[in-house]
Amino acid sequence: MAIREILTVPDPILKEVSQPVDQVDDDLRELMDDMLQTMYAADGIGLAAIQVGVPKRVIVMDLAGSDEEAKPRYFVNPVLSDPSDTLKPYEEGCLSVPTVYDEIERPDRIHIQYLDYDGNECEEIAEGMFAVCIQHEMDHLEGVLFIDYLSRLKRQRAVQKVKKVEKSKDRDAA
């Protein structure tokens, strides 16, 4: 397993639409393992393959709390349907938009179909934080970031903030 670089805004790769996966094989499982390791190293709860520069429809997630045992989840070619009419606001953040958080409204319940780590077909109802996280990560697969839901001014400020943080990191590393 390897920790991969997480792309940050304004990297244009993050705006690409991810492509479906043909099959779940050892190469894909290696990608998912790397993604999970990368997500854990960055203290995240979800990561889409496009965030590590791989435009495939793959998501990893772990919503276990810091005091709980890890509960990794893998979603290959996920499809969302039947969102609830009830929207709930949640404060969201993103590993590709570090240090930026804002409230986003999303359906609080949604149906999801996907292939798991072993290529098995699965479906379930996502609710609460799981629903928020899967919708957030699904947006990545469509080239959408959570800041795209914000006003133009807030979005511009977010990108500037990330650029400043990244520049500071680069300066510190030099």
Swiss-Prot record:
GO terms for biological process: co-translational protein modification; translation. Binds 1 Fe(2+) ion. The active site is at 137. Its EC number is 3.5.1.88. Coiled coil: none annotated. GO terms for molecular function: metal ion binding; peptide deformylase activity. Pfam families: Pep_deformylase. InterPro entries: Peptide_deformylase (IPR023635), Peptide_deformylase_sf (IPR036821). Fe cation binds at residues 94, 136, 140. Its cofactor is Fe(2+). It comes from the Bacteria. Belongs to the polypeptide deformylase family. Removes the formyl group from the N-terminal Met of newly synthesized proteins. Requires at least a dipeptide for an efficient rate of reaction. N-terminal L-methionine is a prerequisite for activity but the enzyme has broad specificity at other positions. This is Peptide deformylase. The lineage of its organism: Bacteria, Pseudomonadati, Pseudomonadota, Alphaproteobacteria, Maricaulales.
